Structure formats: structure tokens, C-alpha cells
Amino acid sequence: MTVTFKQRVTVIFICEDEMKTLLSSTQAGSLILTLNRPERANSFNFEMINELRNALTAAEADPQVRCVVITGGGKVFSAGQDITEMKQGEKISYREHLERTYNPLILQIRSMGKPVIAAVNGPCAGAAFGVALACDLRIARSTAYFVVGFSGIALAPDSGVSLFMPKYIGLGRAQEYYYSNKPITAKQALEWGMVNQVGGFNFDALVRQVAGELASGPREAFAAGKKAFNHAILPNLEDSLRYEGILQEEAGKTAEHHEGVSAFLAKRKPKF
């Protein structure tokens, strides 16, 4: 039996020269995709998610690309979903938003037949945490940290966090850090097995080294190995993403959530 993610999604192809929220470069068989919305702490909006999905689709089809690295521009990996866009943009349900954006992105990363590295150069929160956890490997800068984030605005975990996080660090720790919203340091994440390696001043060189090693490896075997791991560990990924959407739909209607968002935008502590 082989796990196949069945969700159908639409990808709108964008030429690399037209990308507004990503920077793209190649090196020794690796494609480096840099989240580039510095004015918004590299938070995700519809445009960035579409551009990232398009870039991954192109990388999958390009025989010259044998490994993909996702990182953040500047000192931040990503603050997660751009809350301002959700407040000001098209009025769709949270469930529909996930089905259009993060769910297909997470499934695409896991089903991609090439290794994907999250090079976590700085703070990583919310949906971006889910994106990083979906990648095959995580390399963190020593000053980076992870924040589950969702409970701060009275939401349930989404973007696969409810599935990935307990698998990496156990259910008790996952619930503790969801409830408390405390940061997980790079050092702690390494000790718990949530990240594979941590680099200080040598972070960039470490990422290049690991990406180069993967790019020079057996491509077809790596693709088969990833399928095997998906089958063994993540057979319920698609169902988990769907269920997260159901829960988020309900959480998004609560007075607690409205208070959480208002407090976030006003930069004050919420009163739940």
C-alpha cells in the first residue's frame, strides 16, 4: 500500500521574474526559496503561498533541481499567517482558507519526490511552524525559536501542527507549548529531535553543506524513501488537515477569537 494524498488543488503558474514575495536562487543542484516580505515579518498571504506552491511545482519538474531549501529573508523565518490580510481581504471561512492555502501546501511538501529543507534563520510561528514541520529536515540558526502561536488568538492548531508536533516531541510537550504559547528555543528543539541540526555563525554554510549532500544523493531512492516514511508515519495527514479546518471554522466564530485578533492588532494582552 502506498499513501497518496488525493486533495486536488489549482496552481496558477507565475514566472520567476514576476514573483513578488519570494527570492529564488540555485546552487549545486539545490533551489533556495527565500520568503521575502520583510515589512510583514515574512508572514504568509495568498500571493506568497501561491508563489511558493508554483516554485515547488517547477522544482519537482526540473531535473536540475535535486533538493529545495525554504528559508526567510532577514532575521525572521516567518511570523505565520498575515492576520491583517485575513481581516481586510476576501471574506471566506477559515476552513475554506485552509483548503485553498496551507492544506495543499503541506500536502505538496510531503508528496514532493525531492528533499525539502526548512532553514529556520529566525523566529518561526503559527502556520509557518507547520510549514517547517512538514519539511524533511529542519536546520535552525542558534538564535531561532519556534512558537505554536494559535492559542494567542484563540485558534486551534492548523497547517498540520496538531499532527506533526506530537510526532516530534510527544503529546504532553505539544499540548504544553500550544496552551502556554511559550517559545521553543533552537537548542531545546534539537534536544527533543524537532530540528536536525543547529548552526551559529556557520548556519548558512551548514545549510549549503546539507543541501549539497542531499542534492548529490540517489534521487529515485530518496523519493521512494519519502513515500515509505509518509506511509508509515503520516497515513492520516490529509484527514488531520481536514479536521483541523473543521475545528478552526468553529474557533474562528468565537468571541475569544475576535478578542484575540483585536488584542493582537492593538498590541495588547487579550482578555479571554
Predicted regions and their residues:
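Conserved CoA-thioester-binding segment of acyl-CoA-metabolizing enzymes
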Residues: 14-73, 107
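Short C-terminal tail/terminal secondary-structure segment
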Residues: 233, 269-272
